[in-house]
């Protein structure tokens, strides 16, 4: 199922295309020696078009790219309808943002992504032996994610089942701190959240913890893997929430939501995400990986009482710590200026912007050679880094289906699951209903690929 040169694209094949996630731009880091690319001829006078979100690459970074590479970046607002139109018209952007964990297999299966192995092989900046294993999220061999050709690269990453906790909240509730390097169980995590939550006059004043992941799609596939199973069948053409492992994962998540100890579809956080709530001392545990340290590091008092903890595990299950995002860029197969696009790709993922991201603590760099730039000046930064470095040993790719997007999965789940979270539907009934609607969507996606 590799890309076929000259294959035609139709709108029907992209009816359910969607992409989500966050790619963050960063100001260039001054004073760093840069490796020099010798792989492409893109240079002065060239321009490339990136389909990204406004926050992905700031105007000053665009100016820095022109200064460093001689290439002008033009941006197009990320919009799936516009992307479909550009792809089918044969005039796509030169680089497109996507979420490696849930988008790679979907786009690769539809023959729209350029295989980047030849580019990596010639690059003096992005060397194969320097790539962190998280970049395997951007590989797909026609059947399974994590194997085969490379179609993109993550800009940075976190192991998103890890969590931060506030020691002051634990002290106040008389709850023991989790072990520094060994995981507690999901059952213990939820019990801690029940003890940590604070309510007054029927209102939640301090959330015990949040554990909803970046997307429900990535969360539930990861939870099922942690229970020792797979949410999908062998050829990824069906989900099955009724298997013992998937049911265990689903039950735990519904129990978390029913307990109302943290934000969920039935208990919204007014801030919209964990950062401001955790920063205000109104969240005892935050299911955010290393990347949130970029915010925590800006507040010394908060950093002093914050700890990063390993991803929980199910009792008797394997120890896994996946990445639920791995957001980055891919090159359309019909892009018009591939050499210049690759030069920008190298610059964004391996030169000044990548070094700035690594130094800021907003995610783990996806080049191993950049890890020494991760913040380690203070004692609390050293403590966080110790936990994170140990956790890297437990990373693995949790493959996602090529026949449905993470956004489509989430939309269906979000329509059905609240009834179970409110106690109006049993977990078994929810599992059967999810199987029905998600498998119907997967069936349509498989027909499109065929």
What are these regions (language model features)?
Residues 1-112, 122-128, 315-318, 327, ...:
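Conserved N-terminal structural module of periplasmic/extracytoplasmic solute-binding proteins
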Residues 67, 88-89, 254-261, 298-364, ...:
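Extracytoplasmic/periplasmic substrate-recognition and gating elements
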Residues 117-133, 179-182, 200-209, 229-248, ...:
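Short, solvent-exposed loop/beta-turn-alpha elements that line the ligand-binding surface or hinge
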Residues 145, 309-310, 359-411, 415, ...:
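Long, aromatic- and glycine/proline-rich binding clefts that accommodate carbohydrate-like moieties
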Residues 193-195, 235-267, 311:
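Glycine-centered hinge/linker elements that transmit conformational signals in sensory
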């Amino acid at each position: 199922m590799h890309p076929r040169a000259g294959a035609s694209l139709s709108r029907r094949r992209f009816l359910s295309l969607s992409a989500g996630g966050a790619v963050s731009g960063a100001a260039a880091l001054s004073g760093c020696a840069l490796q020099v690319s010798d792989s492409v001829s893109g240079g002065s006078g060239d321009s490339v078009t990136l389909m990204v979100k406004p926050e992905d690459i700031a105007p000053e970074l665009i100016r820095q790219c022109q200064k460093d590479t001689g290439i002008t970046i033009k941006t197009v607002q990320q919009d799936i309808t516009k992307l479909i139109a550009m792809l089918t018209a044969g005039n796509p952007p030169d680089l497109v943002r996507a979420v490696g964990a849930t988008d790679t297999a979907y786009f690769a299966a539809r023959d729209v992504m350029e295989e980047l192995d030849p580019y990596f092989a010639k690059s003096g900046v992005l060397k194969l032996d320097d790539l962190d294993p998280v970049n395997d999220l951007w590989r797909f061999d026609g059947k399974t994610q994590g194997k085969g050709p490379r179609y993109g690269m993550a800009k940075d990453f976190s192991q998103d089942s890890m969590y931060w906790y506030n020691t002051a909240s634990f002290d106040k509730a008389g709850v023991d701190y989790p072990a520094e390097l060994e995981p507690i169980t999901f059952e213990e995590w939820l019990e801690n959240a029940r003890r940590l939550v604070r309510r007054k006059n029927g209102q939640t004043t301090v959330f015990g913890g949040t554990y909803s992941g970046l997307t429900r799609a990535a969360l539930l596939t990861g939870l099922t893997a942690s229970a020792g199973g797979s949410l999908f069948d062998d050829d990824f053409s069906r989900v099955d929430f009724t298997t013992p492992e998937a049911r265990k994962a689903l039950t735990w998540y519904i129990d978390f939501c029913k307990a109302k100890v943290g934000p969920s579809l039935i208990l919204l956080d007014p801030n919209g995400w964990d950062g401001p709530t955790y920063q205000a001392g109104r969240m005892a545990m935050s299911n955010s990986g290393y990347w949130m340290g970029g915010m925590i590091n800006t507040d010394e008092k908060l950093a002093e009482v914050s700890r990063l903890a390993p991803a929980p595990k199910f009792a008797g299950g394997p120890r896994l710590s996946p990445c639920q995002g791995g957001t980055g860029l891919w090159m359309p197969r019909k892009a018009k200026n591939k050499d210049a696009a690759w030069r920008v790709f190298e610059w964004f993922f391996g030169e000044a912007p990548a070094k700035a991201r690594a130094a800021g603590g907003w995610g783990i760099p996806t080049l191993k050679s950049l890890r020494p730039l991760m913040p380690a000046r203070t004692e609390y930064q050293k403590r966080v880094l110790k936990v994170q470095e140990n956790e890297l040993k437990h990373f693995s790719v949790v493959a996602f289906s090529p026949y449905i997007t993470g956004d489509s999965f989430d939309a269906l789940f979000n329509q059905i699951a609240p009834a179970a979270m409110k106690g109006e539907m049993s977990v078994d009934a929810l599992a059967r209903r999810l199987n029905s609607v998600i498998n119907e969507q997967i069936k349509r996606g498989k027909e499109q690929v065929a």
